[in-house]
Structure formats: C-alpha cells, structure tokens
Amino acid sequence: MEKYENLGLVGEGSYGMVMKCRNKDSGRIVAIKKFLESDDDKMVKKIAMREIKLLKQLRHENLVNLLEVCKKKKRWYLVFEFVDHTILDDLKLFPNGLDYQVVQKYLFQIINGIGFCHSHNIIHRDIKPENILVSQSGVVKLCDFGFARTLAAPGEVYTDYVATRWYRAPELLVGDVKYGKAVDIWAIGCLVIEMLMGQPLFPGESDIDQLHHIMTCLGNLIPRHQELFYKNPVFAGVRLPEIKDIEAEPLESRYPKLPEVVISLAKKCLHIDPDKRPLCADLLHHDFFQMDGFAERFSQELQLKIEKDARNNSLPKKFQIRKKEKDDALGEERKTLVVQDTNADPKTKDSKVLKVKGSKIDVEKTEKGTRASNGSCLHDNGTSHKGLSSTSLRDCSNVTIDHPRNPGTAIPPLTHNLSAVAPGINAAMGTIPGVQNYRVDEKTKKYCNPFVKPSQPSPSGIYNMNVSASVSNCPLPRKSKHSPPLDLAVSMGARRVKLYLETESET
C-alpha cells in the first residue's frame, strides 16, 4: 500500500473505512476500503472475503470496478475506482425529488446493474441511495457488495438480517430465510418513489413499525409471512394489525401527482408477494422506459458516457498532474484586468476580460445586448471603430471565467486624453504621465500603425508602442462634456496644420 498517497477520509462504517488515495506511479485517484483487523473478527473476515470473491467475478459498467486487493498487518485493503458522488448526495441537494428524466436515467442503469448480478445468481441485498455511485459523466455504479451473496442451493438458507430497514422486503422483516432476487426488486420500488419525491417511502423506526408502514400502503402480508411472523421470537407477544381495504392508503392516493406509469412500475416492484415481483429484464421493458423511445436513445448516450469515463481513468500521470494543477489554479485568486467601454449604453455595453497568469494573457469577450457602434477602438477582427472611448480598469481576481477558445485582441481602447496613460498590467492604479506601452500580438500590430511610433526592438511577437500626442491620423470622438482636453488638443493641432500649410504655400 506504500504506492498510494492518502488524500483523506471518504466515510466509515461498522466494518472499516473508505479513503481517497492517489497512486504515486500513475497519478490515478482511487478509493481504498480498509477493513478492520479481519483475523480478530470472524464477521469482518466473512464480509471482506465475500466482497472480494464476488467483485472478482463481476465486471459491468454499472458496478464499481475492483482494481486491486492486498492484505497488510491482518487488514484487507480493496482498491476501487474513485467515484465521490452518490444518489443520496443528489437527494440532499434536491429534497423535493430529482428531475423525472434524471430518475429515468439513474433507474435504467440501476436495474441494468442488478440484472447483471442476478444473471450470475448473485443478489446484492443492500440496495439503497448511499450504495449507488454516480460518476461525473452520469454513469451509475452499484457498490458495497459486503452483504451480497450467491443464490442458495435447494435446501440452503440465508442469514435474515440484511439490507437497511427502509428498503427491506417483507420476507426479510418477518425472518424468512428462503428469499431470492425479489428482495432487490423490492428495493428498486422503494427507490423509484424516493428519487421522485425526495423522501423515503417506508421510513420505519423498527421492524414492526416498518411492517406497519408497508401494510398500511400495500395491504396484509401473505399467509406464509404471517405464519413466520408469529413464529419469530423477535415479535413474541406482538400481533400484526389487520388492514381493511377502507383503511389502506395505496400509492396512487398517497402520491396523486405522480404519473400513472410511475405508480404502475412501483406497484410491480412492491408486490407484497415476492413470487409475483417481476425480473429486471421485465422492468426494462416497462412503459416507464419504453415510452418515447427512451431506452433505445439512452442506451446510445450511455455508451458515450462510459467511453468518456474510461478515457478519464486511463490518463497518463503527467496529464493527470497537469490537469490537477489547472483545477487547483482555477480555485485560487487570479489577477484580471477588465477593459470596458464605460460611455456606452448599459444595454449595449461590450467588455473584454483579460486573465493574467505569468506571461500569458487570455482575453474573453463578454457581450450584453447588441454591440455599441462607438464602443472600443478595435473590433474583434481588428477593424477600427469611428470613435475612441475611455478605459476603465479594475481588479477582478474573484471573478470566475472560463478559458476562451479564440483569444481576441490584447490591446485596450485608447483614452480620450492621448497624453495620459492608463495603468499598466503590473502597475498600480492611477495615471502616469509620459509614454504608454501596450503589448500587442502579431495580429494587432498592423492596425495600430496610425497611432504609434516603434521604439526599441522587443522580443519576437511582442511590441512596445509609444503613443504620441499627434492626432493627424486618429479618428475623432464625438464631442462630450467629459473630454475638453481632447477638443482643445484637436483645435490646437488643426491651427498648427493650417499655419504650416499657409507657410508652405507662401514659400
């Protein structure tokens, strides 16, 4: 286990804990289940051995992938692919229930995964929201096979205490030891309602309370289960309530807003008689999945999601580290410059956001409404506008911005007062008298010629431009009460040109 770096605790339970780790060689993020000392606890050893055995033979896109198994100092360690999101997390985010289409996609995959287990004569026995992982691409994966087991041979019996109470079928609650795949189908029915409504269907506080919730909604237990109930010493001295039809509150009455197709699917899964519950293959052919061609359409979409996850999991170490550094950088404060036309109408304002990191500047253009005809000095394609606008610079280090695909021009619009200087990228806020330097790319250079005189040579691809006070070739702005210095400069410049021409003509 020395090749793994511990990144933190994901969760812990009765039999051990799960840690988030990184493989030092490949850089891959994994989840490691660390069991308690199994040599000292027979139950822990039994659960660990069962999970290892079953997961080694189960490989499916909707089951969590076991990568490695090792034992160190009496402890078993199971290394899994890392998926940090569960359906329980979704239910916490959306307490009123998930979107109908999301539930369709989740449930389709859950049934696929359970069906694969059943086809290998394995029952999960602990289906619940926290045991259903969801990848970033939306691929569902069943996990925690500690209670799973192969179907019994004729005459063999199971342990009776399995599954979290709220998702436990009636046969498990009364202590039947000859149950089968139907216990997983029951849990699916509980999940359908919970995912759509946001609340557990049967939130019993004890086994007898759980039975009461079930019987109030679905009616009396079958005779075999009633007999087992009264034989079970756990329920000694307790009588089952007799639920009359008028007292029952069926699903359609309890959830009148749910579509009929949802109630139909849930009722099939929640049949009080386990022998009458459908198989997973039958559920996938239910109208809930077949209406509007959902099953066929989503099967193709799911394949793309699975391929995407496979690519992400097989990234080389260097790429993963680079990607991690990039993600970390997005979380840190970055200094940015916002060059914005402050005189334009607010409804038609254009702005350019420049992200500065090291020597690189990314430019992202954001538009609000239509473009102003007299906005910034340069269009995206480099052509000049008819006017000049003032420049507003502010620190936007807290703004989250995506990387643009095609960075635009890196030169901000010129100020009204051409003798003044806007703050440089690394300079303090405020104006500095003298010469203004702009760093522009190769694409922009040719559009700046009317405004600038080249100074000392600069590194390849970057040019320093000295903006002089000459305005002979510069397009003039419209008159504004905020720009008397420019009007004065233009007037004086025009007089000098006129005097110069008169002198030339006389000579």
UniProtKB/Swiss-Prot annotation:
Residues annotated for ATP binding in this entry: 10-18, 33
Catalysed reaction equations from the record: L-seryl-[protein] + ATP = O-phospho-L-seryl-[protein] + ADP + H(+); L-threonyl-[protein] + ATP = O-phospho-L-threonyl-[protein] + ADP + H(+)
Pfam families assigned to the protein according to its UniProt record, in alphabetical order: Pkinase (PF00069)
Gene Ontology, cellular component aspect: cytoplasm; nucleus
MF (Gene Ontology): ATP binding; cyclin-dependent protein serine/threonine kinase activity; protein serine kinase activity; protein serine/threonine kinase activity
SUPFAM superfamilies, alphabetized: Protein kinase-like (PK-like)
Subcellular location field: Cytoplasm; Nucleus
Active site residues of this protein: 126
Domain of life: Eukaryota
Motif [NKR]KIAxRE, residue numbers: 45-51
Keyword tags: ATP-binding, Cytoplasm, Kinase, Nucleotide-binding, Nucleus, Serine/threonine-protein kinase, Transferase
rRNA-binding in keyword set: no
CDD domains listed in its UniProt record: STKc_CDKL2_3
EC number: 2.7.11.22
InterPro entries assigned to the protein according to its UniProt record, in alphabetical order: CDK (IPR050108), Kinase-like_dom_sf (IPR011009), Prot_kinase_dom (IPR000719), Protein_kinase_ATP_BS (IPR017441), Ser/Thr_kinase_AS (IPR008271)
Family statement: Belongs to the protein kinase superfamily. CMGC Ser/Thr protein kinase family. CDC2/CDKX subfamily.
Domain notes: The [NKR]KIAxRE motif seems to be a cyclin-binding region.
Name assigned to this protein: Cyclin-dependent kinase-like 2
Organism in which the protein naturally occurs: Rattus norvegicus (Rat)
